[in-house]
Amino acid sequence: MARHIVQAIQSHAFATPYKCALSDSRGDLGYADLDSFSTRFAMRLQDLGCRPGDRVVMLASRRALLVAAIIGVFKAGCVHVPLDPRMPADRLRYILHDVAPTLVIADEDLIDAIEHALPVAAPIVPVTELERLLDDADSPRLDALVQPLPLPPLDERAIAYCIYTSGSTGRPKGVLINHRSIADFFEGTRAVYDVTAQSRCASFSPLNFDVYLMDMLFPLAQGASLYVHDDVNAPDLLFDAIRVHDVTHFSAWGMMLGLIAQAEEFEAAPLPHLKTILTGTDVPDVKTVQRWLRKNAGVQVINAYGPTEATCAATAHVIREIEPERRTLYPIGKPLEHVRALLVDEGGNRITAPGVPGELMIGGTQVMQGYWNLPEETAARLVRLDGVPFYRTGDVCAYLADGSLYYMGRKDNEVKIGGYRIHLSEIQRVINSVPHVYGSEVVLLESRYGETLLAAGVLLERGAPLDADCKADEIRQRLAAELPAYMVPRHVKVLDQFPQLSSGKTDRKALLSILQQRINESNQEEVNS
């Protein structure tokens, strides 16, 4: 099995040249065409001045052609830097100044904003130029090259991508992952995610989110066919994409998995080809997972866990049984093949006993090379244990009796109210167990009197029988029955949806503002009445 993603695609192009590699609403691309286009695009990058190690920014909406362009970036030896095309102007300006790209690939309607944000002039390749390059193998720009440069040799040590995540300082930071980490991640993933050359996969992930590795590139490395869904996350459209394209494998973070299950045809329309669902990013709701397991016999759900700094996913737990009486969250499982996982207490001492919470440390070859231009931050988050660099995740976990890891929440998601330490995820677990609830978030608010209190936002399944106020009362009653009084949120608000970051995670800052506004409106109504 080829280690480098480029080698894998070249191998499939030779063995199955006409097999569909990529498709979307615009058409499809076979493996030979994928290999040919990505080579031509790599040469085009060289023509525009890109050299190995240079950063190539991608600011564009999700589509199959851009997945092919990523392979071209890798062939040129460049660093893929995917950014959210919807990001605020200030954030875009900061990242472009930080990463100093040699070239930018962008949707045409973003070009003016990019030109104003770039610190120094750099070529901007519109997506329409990629379309022309795909349609015309004898591109005149390529003919104009007197002596095309040879493509650089593939190097596992070279940086493959730089993905920007939210930083603890409030500034985004670029996570650097090399090709060896990707190759080892793919090796470990094969043991749990059963994608083969016969699989038909669907991708719903944003291009600027590291899940694209498992969502898009992993299926291509296996020789599978990949359908790339348009940038529209409506439940009915997502469900139809799975049904119409006879999808066997797809991935969706926990909240999106619940969203797709709200499709009008979800219960009635069968999905006979579906085999495996990969979820993660946020904690999957038990009831939502059970609904998917019931879709047809043999479906399995993989609950994967891993920060961007550990190459997408570091642990995985396979769920096959419905377990109708289950009340606890699903484990995040055991480390992948090239990953080491340790739990440590506040003093840095290792924890081995089941049930004892500690911070999760991740080591092995999947760990990042560091943060771009942030040596001090890199040194603070990468610590050496047994001579091996380990990443401090900031996540609190505990061992189960079988050695699996159970996720308990973020260290910074542990709050203190009235002297009591509270893990917000425990409150969410109880809320999500209430019938017709498929998602919840708990936040800390400050009242007008300076009092610290808990508030919960809740998402209900389509067709929930009770109105919002009655359901909120039912949730409060369940919380009061299962949790001590200090863990029961003062306010429970049913919302239509949660604001999302480009990664698909809930935007907790925006949610906090929404809940605060809803609570203020309710208080005003009480005063007026």
Residue ranges and their predicted role:
Residues 60-63, 84, 195, 205-209, ...:
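Conserved AMP-binding
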Residues 38, 157-175, 186-193, 502:
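ATP phosphate-binding P-loop of adenylate-forming
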Residues 2, 60-63, 78-97, 108-111, ...:
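ATP-dependent adenylate-forming carboxylate-activation enzymes
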Residues 173-200, 209-248:
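Conserved AMP-binding/adenylation subdomain of ANL enzymes
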Residues 146-164, 171, 195-201, 207:
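Conserved pre-ATP/AMP-binding loop-to-beta segment of ANL
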Residues 1-161, 184, 285, 289, ...:
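AMP-binding/adenylate-forming domain of the ANL superfamily
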Residues 4-6, 104-152, 182, 300-303, ...:
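AMP-dependent adenylate-forming
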Residues 221-224, 247-251, 261-327, 331, ...:
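Gly/Ser/Thr-rich phosphate-binding loop
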